[in-house]
Amino acid sequence: EHDEDPRRRQRAGQQEIAKVARILQDIGGDIPAEIDWIIRVDGHTDNIPIVGNTDFADNWELSQARALSVVRYMINVLGIEPERLSANGFGEYQPVNPANTPQARAQNRRIELKFTER
């Protein structure tokens, strides 16, 4: 269900985030100054409840923490202005695949970057 090597998965995710963030920054440079835009970072989880000894009370907290981690990466590593970012957590409540299978759950554990007006 999960990639065996979390470091490899994290590196791949960071590369994808960096690629998309650069595209969004380029687009931002072409937008008129009077339009107040942000990159919205949305965290999502699968539908498996969090139980046991964990840092997160539930999937809401986990999705928010994932989004915040990406926002911090975009600020600290990619140099994106914090005023241009928003971190949001949606828990398990906006699945892209409603099936109750390992593949669907993997698809639902995701980060989405959305370019939008503030």
Place the predicted regions along the sequence by residue:
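Periplasmic OmpA-like peptidoglycan-binding domain that tethers envelope proteins to the cell wall
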Residues: D3-R7, R11-I23, G28, W37-R40, ...
